[in-house]
Amino acid sequence: MNFIETARFRRAYKTLPEDAKLRVKDTLRKLDENFRHPSLQVKKIKGTKDIWEARVSLDYRMTFQVVRNYFILRNVGHHDPTLRNP
């Protein structure tokens, strides 16, 4: 699959500390290799239409949509704020 980054995702990614950026890159690699990789804990976000979350680390989450052969990366950041505004 291919990745499309929204402007919001790029802005949020730039604000992350370097260790979190490395974890995001690792998460994207795993997502590309196996959407259901156990460490990602991928699940749909309740109350949204086709928006998913993946675990980056204990504190960080990323949100995305799957459209055809693309992952549309929507947001990334600390767990609660990211999931409140996926």
Task: Walk through the language-model features, giving the residues of each.
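A short, surface-exposed loop/turn module that caps and links secondary-structure elements
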Residues: 29-54
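Enriched for short, Lys/Arg-rich terminal
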Residues: 2-4, 11, 18, 22, ...
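Residues in soluble alpha-helical coiled-coils and helical-bundle/repeat scaffolds
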Residues: 15-18, 36
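Short amphipathic alpha-helical/adjacent loop interface patches that line ligand
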Residues: 13, 28
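Basic nucleic-acid-binding interfaces
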Residues: 4-8, 14, 43-50
